[in-house]
Amino acid sequence: MKKLMVIPLVAAGMAAMVGCSKTPVKEAAKNDAINLANLDTAVAPGTDFYQYACGGWMKNNPLKPEYARFGTFDQLRDNNQEQIRTLIEGLSETPGQEGSVGQKIGMLFAMGMDSVKLNEDGYAPIKDQLAEINKLGTKDELTKMVATLHKEGMAPFFALYVGADEKNSSMNIVQLYQAGLGMGDRDYYLLEDESSQKMREAYKNYITRLFTLIGSSPEQADAAVNAIMKIERGIAEVSFSREDLRDSQKNYNKMSIEGFKAKNDLLNWDVYFESMGMMDIKYLDAKQLSFYEGLSALMKNTTLDEQKYYLTFNLLSSAAPYLSDPFVAADFDFYGKTMSGRQEQQPRWKRALSTVNGALSEAVGQMYVAKYFPASSKEKMLKMVGDLQKALGDRISSLEWMSDATKAKAQEKLAAFIVKIGYPDTWRDYSGLEIKNDSYWANVRRSNIFEVNYMLADVDKPVDKTRWGMSPQTVNAYYNPTTNEICFPAAILQPPFFNPEADDAVNYGAIGVVIGHEMTHGFDDQGRNYDKEGNLSDWWTAEDAALFTQRADRLAQQYSDIIVVDSCLLYTSDAADE
C-alpha cells in the first residue's frame, strides 16, 4: 500500500533475457477463508506470534531467487501476471487489425520476447541518440538535449511533472523536482560507511560496463566514470535529504517563471521551456528551490564534455533493459542484484509483460477487468469502505487529546474522501500511440513520449479527479492527498485480500486492513497537512498539532528501538498500520 505522491516519469524497465514455458493460471479457491496450513501450531503464540501466524505459509512459500522478498502481495502479483499473460499472449500470436489496441499490445509483447532480434540489434537502436549527444557544442544545444531526454521519460539533473498545485488543488501546475542520481538516494554518494563505499564501486563498474559495451576505450570509460561520479556527487550534495523531502511546506515553492530564472542559470530556461512546448506558462512550483541554485554552481564547475558523458550515461542506463542481453545483464547485476538483492533475473515474459503494462496500462486493465473483476465486487467494496469510514469517524470522535475544532475538520475531511474501486469510469485512448516493428527500445521511447505529452497537456488546466494514479491490474492501493482520494484497483481485490464469496469477517480482516491503512494516510504526518479539498493547509490548532507530534515521536522511538532503519522514514506507514 502506498500514499500516492507525485512522482516524475522516469524511463525504467525490464527487458529481454531467457524464455519461459507456459504455465496454467492457478485459480484462487473461492471459498477459502483462513487456511490453517499457513499456521505453525508447533510454536506457542505467546512465545513467537509471528512464527505461529505465518510459519506454515513461509515454509510452503520459500523465497524465490527472482525476488528479494516474498509475501502475500508478491504471491498475488505472480498469479496476476499469469492471468494477464493469458490475455496478452493470444494477441502476440494473432495480432488484431493494424493500429488497434490489440495489435499494439500484441506487437510490443512479441518484440520484448524476440531475443534473436534484440541480440542482433545490439545497441543499434540508440546509436543515433548517442551521436546527437556526442556532437553537442553549446549550452543551448545541451539545454535542448536535456529537454529531449525529459520528453522521453528520463530525468537528467532534475525532473519535470505536471500535477495539482498543492495550495490550489483544483488546478494543475508545472512542478520541478530534484533528480539525476543513478543510485537514487543521495546517501549512497555521501556516506563513508563500508556499505556505501561498496555500492559506489559497484556503480562505477556498472558505468564502465555500459560504456565498454558501446565500444569506448578503457581511457574513455574511465573518463566517463570520473565525470559521472563528479556530477552525481555534486547533485547529491545539494539534494534534500529523505527527511526534508517529507516536509510538504518546505517542498512547496510556487513562483513566477521570471522569478525562477532570476534565481538560477542552470540551463537556458527559455530554450528549455520552448523545447518542452511550454512557452506560455507563467508560474511553476520549484519543489526543492535551493537544489536548482546549487546545481547551477555545479554546472559552472563541470566541462561540456563531462556533461555529455553524464547525458550519455542517462541514455545508456535507461535503454539498457530494452537492448541486447549484455546490456540487460549489466542492468540486472547492478540494480537487481547489488541494489535490490535479487539472485536471478525475472523470466523474459514477465519483463515483456511489465513493459506492456507500462506502455498501455489502461488498455491492458480494461481486458483484465472484463475477465477478472465482476461488478458485484465493486458494490461490496463500496459498502465496506463506508463502514470503515464510519468506524474511523467514531475513533476520531473518541480521541481525548484532540480538540472539538480539529475533530470537526477531520470529520469533514473523512466524509469528503473520493473512493475509487476497481477501475476508472472512462478508459484512456491509445490511438495516438504508435507501436512499430523497428525496435523494442524505439517503442518504449515512443511510449514515454506519449505519456509525457499526455501529462503536458494538463499544464494550467483543471485537475481531472476522475483519473487514476494506478492501473486496475496493479496489486496495490493508495491515498492521494491533493485529491483526498483512496483507490483500490481490481487486482488487489482478489483472494486472499478480498473474496466476494467469503464471510464478511474474513474480508474485513483482510482488505479491511488495507482500506483502513489508506484512510489513515489522510491523517498521518504528511496527509494531515492537506485539507478536505486537497490543499496544503494547516487546519489543526497549534495545541493539537503539538500533541500529534508528541505521540508521533513516541511511535517513531518505538520503531527505532526494534528495527535498524531510520524510523522517521517509516512513520507514514507505521502510523497507518497502528
Predicted regions and their residues:
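Bacterial N-terminal signal peptides
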Residues: 8-15
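C-terminal motif of bacterial Sec signal peptides marking the signal peptidase cleavage site
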Residues: 18-19
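Short, Gly/Pro- and small/polar-rich lid/capping loops
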Residues: 25-36
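Active-site-surrounding "flap" and adjacent substrate/cofactor-binding loops of secreted or lumenal enzymes
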Residues: 45, 52, 56-109
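Noncatalytic, helix-rich "gating/capping" subdomain that lines the substrate-entry/channel surface
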Residues: 91-383
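Intrinsically disordered, low-complexity linker/terminal regions across diverse proteins
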Residues: 228, 263-266, 285-289, 346-353, ...
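A short, hydrophobic C-terminal helix/tail in secreted or cell-surface proteins
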Residues: 574-578
